[in-house]
A protein has these predicted regions:
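Outer-membrane beta-barrel proteins
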Residues: 2-7, 11, 15-205
Length: 205
């Protein structure tokens, strides 16, 4: 999914807007999602609408063998210093890259910490439908962040990510170091990757 707005980040940004249409474009040196390599390089783009905590949007990325096309909607808000959100995300693919994933997204944040949980189902073309739970703990301060995340139920694997993001000349840039275990690797070995991302968001009046 999105390089900048993922999970709770998208939900919480929705909670701060009144009414806003926006478009975004981006590029990643390696497109990883939840510790799993999707494409060795990937351009992307999306559209979002946010209003009084509610959000809806779509996002697409090149995944080498076709396109990943995501759709999502939900609601986020704040109570004092605590942020919360609930939403739905569907991941759809052209070509033969993968099958459909659909999930409910839950999130909560306080201070520098956020917790994300996704409860989903995978339409496995090669076998029975699979259920999964994704969980993540992220600590972020002044653009620097660390994340520990993994899967349970029919999926398995864990990863750790360290990174930094900033806005430079009106561009959102990021650098991340990813450590993923062998369960998330297509080669069956543990994986370490340095990932560079760049993107820009445009307000649509």
């Amino acid at each position: 999914m999105k390089f900048v707005k993922t999970g709770l980040a998208l939900i919480l940004l929705a909670g701060t807007a009144q009414a806003d249409f926006s478009a975004n474009v981006g590029w990643a040196s390696d497109y990883y999602f939840r510790g799993i390599l999707q494409s060795p390089t990937s351009p992307s783009g999306g559209l979002d609408y946010e209003s009084n905590g509610f959000y809806v949007g779509t996002w697409a990325a090149d995944v080498y063998d076709g396109l990943e096309i995501d759709g999502y909607f939900g609601y986020g808000g704040e109570v004092g210093d605590f942020s919360y959100g609930i939403g739905y995300t569907g991941y759809f693919y052209t070509g033969d890259f993968d099958d459909t994933y659909q999930e409910i997204n839950l999130g909560g944040g306080y201070g520098i910490a956020t917790v994300d949980v996704a409860i989903g189902q995978y339409d496995n073309r090669d076998g029975p439908t699979l259920d999964y739970t994704y969980y993540a703990l992220t600590l972020e301060k002044n653009g620097f962040y660390g994340k520990y995340a993994g899967f349970s139920q029919d999926f398995s694997g864990e990863y750790f990510e360290l990174g930094y993001g900033a806005t430079v000349a009106e561009l959102d840039v990021g650098l991340a170091l990813l450590f993923a275990d062998k369960d998330l690797s297509i080669t069956g070995d543990s994986n370490e990757s340095l990932i560079f991302t760049i993107g820009k968001t445009f307000d649509i009046q």
